[in-house]
Amino acid sequence: MLAESFVGFSGVFGDRCYAFKSSGARKGFPYMNANVQQQMLLYRPKFRHPGRAARPPNLDEAMGIAPGVTPANAEPEDMALDVLTPSGAVVAVDDPALTGMLGEGLRGEHRLTLVRSDRALTDCRPVSLISLQTVRQIEGELGRPVDKRRFRANIYLDLASGNGFAEEGLVGRRLRLGSKALVAVLERDPRCKMISLDPETGEHDPEVLRQVARAHEAFAGVYCAVLVEGVLSVGDSVEVVD
């Protein structure tokens, strides 16, 4: 969990800025993920310069120019990434050894190529959001703890109502996050096999997705688009604007 991060039009700064393009993936989404290679979840990425990777290098200067200029992209070194492998070794994300490890055991042809992007390489929308109450409701339905990281949200809300899935009622509305950022809630978030994978162990538990499909039409959380950029911090307030 990040203490703070910049949310821009293309998503959360630094989110999913690296991916491995696979020759065996479908053309619509040509990147390898844990749906294909579950062991990817056992590799722990860490920015070499966490502070520089949390916000654009000229954020303060850009925001000081009315009405607010889009900040510059980070320099490559700002986003340098190291990866802790399951064996305990630490390798740079661009080390060919890492590409080789991630390709082990894959069925069929998967030639992997590292990609770095200045925008988040998200599946669908720039920002995903889910409430802690929704996670707790799913826990109650399953009768066991559920790691919130299964849902891979950019933003976790603690709703005053205390009701699970209440964020679905925000679709079509705008939210003020913190003092400046403004997002439009676009649609419910359709879920796939990823929520059935334990983010700590990589173990597959199909009952998680089955329950969300049975009880909630396979939706959990919502997708958002950023209307006004800004920095978010843990504990920031959330206001429904309209």
Model-derived features with residue positions:
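A conserved acidic, glycine/proline-rich C-terminal tail/linker
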Residues: 192-229
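Electropositive, beta-rich accessory/interaction domains or terminal extensions
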Residues: 1-178, 182-191, 196-197, 231, ...
